[in-house]
UniProtKB/Swiss-Prot annotation:
Pfam family, one: YjfB_motility
Ranges in a coiled coil: 17-44
Protein name, entry field: Uncharacterized protein YjfB
Keywords tagged on the record: Coiled coil
Organism: Bacillus subtilis (strain 168)
Induction and repression of expression: Transcriptionally regulated by SigD.
Length: 55
């Protein structure tokens, strides 16, 4: 294999790895946001279960 072809192949592999890392970081951020929202809901389990009505 000649050097230019090897260089292109290495660049493509590096790019694919960088894209995978970026996607993994995005997934982790989304999972963290979901966990934060879940914890926020768990902190107030009775919130919104009763309604005060006055006539």
């Amino acid at each position: 294999m000649d050097i230019p072809a090897l260089s292109v192949a290495m660049h493509q592999a590096s790019l694919a790895q960088n894209v995978n890392i970026a996607l993994t970081k995005k997934r982790l951020d989304t999972a963290q946001q979901n966990a934060d929202q879940t914890l926020k809901m768990i902190q107030h389990p009775t919130l919104g279960q009763t309604i005060d009505v006055k006539a």
